[in-house]
């Protein structure tokens, strides 16, 4: 019964920790992920939680049992013979000093083991995600060596913990045996002197074993405690991490917006970086307008659009929708009116319908199909073995890059956003498909009066934009329509000639 209840309790601890960790990870800001390795996070949710679970089960019960036995045996020894008890207990402080030094040394070692395991998981995760790139460049041997190097580090750290055990516990046993030797010597002299019987000495020595056993048990458990403590510290680093972007206590729901977007002296730098990515950016986009963002590499294009749904918070100035500062409204009400199609398309394991309806799980099949038609995805989806019920693999394996992007566009359109953000969202489709998608997007923008921000790589995307912003080193170097910038902006013409692709046929 004790074993069952202990295991049930430990599984409950692990269950609650996993839920709490995942819930926190879902809400941490993007700045946190910019500083953390995926492998380290996976290790904390798996291996570190398991170390805590193991100690929370058998370890806690054994520790409590050892403490009770130690206390009870001490009282019994003092009751039987005060002098012999004092001789026996004289070694106890020395044992606890040795154990304390052991715990202080082993704790950082266990933390290093978990960190090395996290690095190993990071390499594994990177290689599994990039297996095609590895094969394409024939880097299998290099990646094998890289994995072996991290694995060697993990092995070395584990062996160091083993050596720490080997270098400390023999001394603990030695001191414990000194206590037994003292009892036999001092008690034997008293037997010879006639003040103690042989039976009493044997009984006392037997009880002494009940004193040393819990001490040694506590010693062994101290290693498990140190390991669980190191894992707990890593787990609570996540649980105690501040959420950089969250609702204010007095945040209000954002009402349905016409979506007038205003950047007012916006400044931004990434957490831990002193370099400003955006430096006092100010502009205004009226409802229903399309704003194209262009700029040199590292000029802050993606950063600018990431501030609209509050993936990050500005470090100066303000971003407003219809006059509402995005920091003063709830995240759910803000993001429910924003549709985003990123350059790197992510699909989840599940059906095509589930992926398109990810933002609106209650959407009907007719609504899903309408969004797919608008994104020019309906035709190829209907050709799949089970149509919209076809299951796609992890990250959309089985679909081409262009097909994945069209599903992502359909997913964004289905939520009927008032603000649509396209981060080079047609980069993986051919020219004919890009022209068809662009035509549909243009029609949807005009008919629904959506405000659109687009980071583009093709001339056709920016030619018809109502406002083009040219960024350079975090500042707006030029703004205006295509015709105005062709006449007035040297930087725009350089980008036009060097970075943008020609307009597709029919675009």
Annotated model-derived regions:
Residues 30-31, 47-56, 60, 64, ...:
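An intracellular "coupling" helix at the cytosolic face of ABC transporter transmembrane type-1 domains
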Residues 11, 31, 39, 43, ...:
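Short active-site loops of ABC-family nucleotide-binding domains
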Residues 1-15, 23, 27, 34, ...:
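Transmembrane-helix motif of ABC transporter permease domains
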Residues 58-112, 185-196:
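Transmembrane helices of ABC transporter permease
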Residues 21, 25, 134, 235, ...:
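Helix-loop junctions and hydrophobic alpha-helical segments within the transmembrane domains
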Residues 247, 254-507:
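ABC-type nucleotide-binding domain
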Residues 92-100, 165-179, 198-223:
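Hydrophobic alpha-helical segments in the permease module
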């Amino acid at each position: 019964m004790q074993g069952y209840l202990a295991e049930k309790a430990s599984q409950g601890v692990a269950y609650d920790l996993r839920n709490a960790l995942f819930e926190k990870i879902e809400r941490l800001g993007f700045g946190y992920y910019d500083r953390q390795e995926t492998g380290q996070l996976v290790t904390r949710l798996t291996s570190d939680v398991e170390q805590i679970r193991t100690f929370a089960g058998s370890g806690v019960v054994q520790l409590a049992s050892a403490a009770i036995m130690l206390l009870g045996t001490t009282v019994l020894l003092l009751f039987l013979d005060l002098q012999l008890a004092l001789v026996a207990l004289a070694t106890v402080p020395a044992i606890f000093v040795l154990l304390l030094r052991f715990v202080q040394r082993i704790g950082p070692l266990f933390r290093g083991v978990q960190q090395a395991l996290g690095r190993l998981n990071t390499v594994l995760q990177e290689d599994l995600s990039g297996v095609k790139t590895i094969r394409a460049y024939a880097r299998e041997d290099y990646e094998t060596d890289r994995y072996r190097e991290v694995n060697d580090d993990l092995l070395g750290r584990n062996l160091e913990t083993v050596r720490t055990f080997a270098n400390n516990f023999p001394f603990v046993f030695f001191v414990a045996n000194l206590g037994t030797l003292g009892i036999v010597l001092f008690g034997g002299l008293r037997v010879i002197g006639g003040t103690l019987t042989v039976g009493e000495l044997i009984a006392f020595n037997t009880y002494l074993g009940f004193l040393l056993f819990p001490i040694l048990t506590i010693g062994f458990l101290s290693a498990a405690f140190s390991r669980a403590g190191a894992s707990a510290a890593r787990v609570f680093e996540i649980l105690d991490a501040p959420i950089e972007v969250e609702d204010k206590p007095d945040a209000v729901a954002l009402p349905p917006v016409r979506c007038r977007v205003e950047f007012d002296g916006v400044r931004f730098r990434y957490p831990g970086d002193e370099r400003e990515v955006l430096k006092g950016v100010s502009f205004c986009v009226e409802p229903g307008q399309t704003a194209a963002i262009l700029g040199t590499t590292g000029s802050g294009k993606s950063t600018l659009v990431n501030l609209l749904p509050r993936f990050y918070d500005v470090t100066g100035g303000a971003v407003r929708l219809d006059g509402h500062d995005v920091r003063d409204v709830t995240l759910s009400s803000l993001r429910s009116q924003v549709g985003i199609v990123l350059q790197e398309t992510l699909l989840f394991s599940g059906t095509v319908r589930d992926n398109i309806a990810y933002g609106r799980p209650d959407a009907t099949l007719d609504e899903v199909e309408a969004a797919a038609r608008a994104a020019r995805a309906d035709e190829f989806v209907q050709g799949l073995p089970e149509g919209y019920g076809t299951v796609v693999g992890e990250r959309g394996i089985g679909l081409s890059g262009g097909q994945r992007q069209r599903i992502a566009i359909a997913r964004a359109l289905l939520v009927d956003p008032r603000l649509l953000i396209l981060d080079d969202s047609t980069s993986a489709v051919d020219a004919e498909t890009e022209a068809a998608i662009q035509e549909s997007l243009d029609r949807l923008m005009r008919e629904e009066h959506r405000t659109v921000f687009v980071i583009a790589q093709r001339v056709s995307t920016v030619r018809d934009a109502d406002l083009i912003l040219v960024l350079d080193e975090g500042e707006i170097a030029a703004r205006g329509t295509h015709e105005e910038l062709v006449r007035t902006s040297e930087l725009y013409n350089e980008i036009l000639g060097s970075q943008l692709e020609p307009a597709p046929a029919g675009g």
